[in-house]
């Protein structure tokens, strides 16, 4: 289990650095002579969907499949298997989602049509955050990395629930019934002891199509499929084999491709009025101010009330640095922004807010942790 966790951190750290590079490349291309080609390519039709929709609806389903696998493993056999281990990350993640949402509504809630974006600043990008933390090397104790990872995993659970409940279109009964039948078939395979992966993967593909047609966002199929893939007591369970095989593809290909496809925003026609509009301000404030206030404040309160203990080997200053890093929303924030709004102008404002809040959080968190001494 320790080797699996170390491998996970290493993959997330390297993947996070590649994600940062992909986002930077997207912004450079979007503000270069290649910009028309970049945007035309993203909106080119490939069968029933555009390239951008294939990335966001199909490839990101694999990202959510991995998220589901990680959540299931952590809660059944990992660092969240005991209730005592869940208390602090759950409190921190819950407060770290509520505070940004409230701050967003304070900035943007009064503007017509913007309430739908309340969930955008609630997310934490684990790959991006771990990538920044990895740059600190030994200055970041293992307990700090574990704390950040567990918060992000619980945060992902909240994000999945929000996507399923708040951003679902009109429901198609027959397609939803088909999805339920397929999911039951996957669970049945586990009950009768099927350990080969291919039957689960075939049914997972059918589940994705059924969920897509049902009106629920197709990426939720990834999480549902993960819950049906068995995690036994053996070290080579179907879940662990799939997680191990999927991790490099998601970390080094799918998430960077998503970042490159979604982070590109042209600043040619963006002025101070758009930068200071309620939507980007609400998102940036939610990520940079709301996340740190919600997470750090709730952790201090939980420890003071005796509900949980401070992570061993980490100072309060270091925990505040982690709270800052949790304001890096990026992947999930951009994803939710695409679900909340369809107007290209609003999508650009979402990108500005997410990039602004995430960059501020990354710089502030890194700087604080970089200059933080050892715990005494």
From Swiss-Prot:
It comes from the Bacteria. HAMAP family: NhaA. GO terms for biological process: regulation of pH. It comes from Rhizorhabdus wittichii (strain DSM 6014 / CCUG 31198 / JCM 15750 / NBRC 105917 / EY 4224 / RW1). Pfam families: Na_H_antiport_1. GO terms for cellular component: plasma membrane. Belongs to the NhaA Na(+)/H(+) (TC 2.A.33) antiporter family. It is found in: Cell inner membrane. This is Na(+)/H(+) antiporter NhaA. Keywords: Antiport, Cell inner membrane, Cell membrane, Ion transport, Membrane, Sodium, Sodium transport, Transmembrane, Transmembrane helix, Transport.
